[in-house]
């Protein structure tokens, strides 16, 4: 399960950031898992992530990792999750939520998916804010979040022990290096 989990994670990262072609429905019936390979069976829900989206999403992830609130606000606005009208309290809560969800995957080492239920964190956040009349994030963000959650759920069920940071850092470096 660790080796298949690593392959699935590597495939996911490559699709998200290098090709920009993302499978939007990563449930079990859409993959065939064999001893030494993963075969994608269903191509009916493939989404193209724009170059601008990928740049902004990576900037957003880097802002979380570097605890850079200025960059977080900049990229959050570009992704449609933050606006210029958001007050400091909302920004602080939003940053705390994003940090709770993403920063465990920035730790060095090999370990299983670190969160029991990331949706619980989101539910707690949403309970404390007024949603009526608020903005909506871009569709690409919803697509990548859904795919991340599907991957996370699969790897959690397998209890795959992975190096989360190393492969992600290599893929993000490759993406950024290809921009030069």
Regions found by a protein language model. Give the residues of each.
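Hydrophobic residue at the +6 position relative to the catalytic HRD Asp in the kinase catalytic loop
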Residues: 29-33
